[in-house]
Amino acid sequence: MNLEQYTKINNFFIRHSTAFSLLLTANRLLTACGFLLYPLLLLCLLTKKNIAMLISFIAIPALCFLAGTIFRKVVNKKRPYEKLPIQSLIKKDKKGQSFPSRHVFSIFLIATLWFCFWKPVGIFLFIAGVFLAIVRVIGGVHFVTDVCAGALLGVLAGLIS
């Protein structure tokens, strides 16, 4: 997105406080949704005594998350509020490390794992992931390329698991 688009979006949310509150709430709830469902998946695998899948669903995502974190530090891509003269709607003091989006990576990874285990929950999380990606871009903390890369890498990491 460019400066004009971000300005229009920011102005809309500044004028409509209810929409602004919904945006911030959506960011928190969608993020929490993925992170709460991941331990539940691991618990399900444990109760089904599927230890091989449990180990795989812990070890590979952890390694991918670590590799992604290191990659973000090396690339150190600026965030929209650093590159453009805008105020992000989602408050974030962090500089750089925008690419790929770790929030979107995580929810798409968890969605893929759930999809392999129980498709309805996976589908729900994929939909939540799309909304989270939109919220992160509208909120001014990521560019579209950041969230698209996060989604793609999350799915790939999930498939490897």
Language model feature labels by segment:
Residues 33-45, 115, 119-126:
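Hydrophobic alpha-helical transmembrane segments
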Residues 43, 68-76, 115, 158-161:
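Membrane-water interface at transmembrane helix exits
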Residues 1-37, 52, 68-96:
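N-terminal transmembrane-helix/juxtamembrane module of multi-pass inner/ER membrane proteins
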